[in-house]
Amino acid sequence: MTAGRDPVAVAALQYCAAGTAEETLRTLMPLIDRAADDGAKLVCLPEAATFLAASRAALADEAEPAGESTVLDRLCNAAARRGIELSIGSMFFLKPDGRHVNRHLLVGADGRICAQYDKIHMFDADVGDGKSYRESHYFAPGDEMVRADSCGMNMGLTICYDLRFPHLYRRLARDGAEMLAIPAAFTFNSGKAHWHVLLRARAIETGCFVVAATQCGTHADGRRTYGHALIVSPWGEIMAEASTDDGNAAAGANDAVIHAALDPHAVTSARTAIPSLGTQPEFS
């Protein structure tokens, strides 16, 4: 139902996470304040929101145990201080078995954690940038889809590489999602070819808003991320977009906060015009 619901003021952040949380927070906290100052009620952070480690050993040193994160506490306090919801695109936590999880967290305006989602699809790929990515060597995959209320809209929580698996998003939409949070740290090579196409496709085929906060720049491990934080309408139109990294920009030059007002009525309108969610046959 959309009757009587007002548009939601959403911001998506773009920046280049450092190799440690402490250094990243010096960039991130002012961006959160900037988004709140500009009127955002929901602020979305990218994948690897607090750090992108230079090595597996550095990941082990920097990641905190789940449930004992002082860095997460600081972000929760920021949400409460500004009276905003935070979609923390992902943080890396240490599990008791020694493995890590890549976890997307939704924090309410009271600073409490409302929902959490562990990344299901591991990025094991070679995208032609001279690096080999094997997330399955570092992280334990999740196994549950997650939706949650965010500012009166139903949000589907996902992370980065999940974007390439459309069945996940159709299921989230059919179960009630109106907004899809797709935080990312897309590599430059794959982003240049696929980023816009994939995000707009997910919006069009689900009739959902897509909010994609993203990393942008060259990180401690040498990877270069694409940027272009995006907010996409249920009709597949780009509502807001940040710039990309040209490879030579000064540190912080590509940091950005983009904004859009998400009107729940646009979801109803798109799905009424093209009712594909309700007409797809089941295949055996």
Cite the ranges covered by each PLM segment.
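Short beta->alpha transition motifs characteristic of CBS
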Residues: F51, R56, L105, Q116-F123, ...
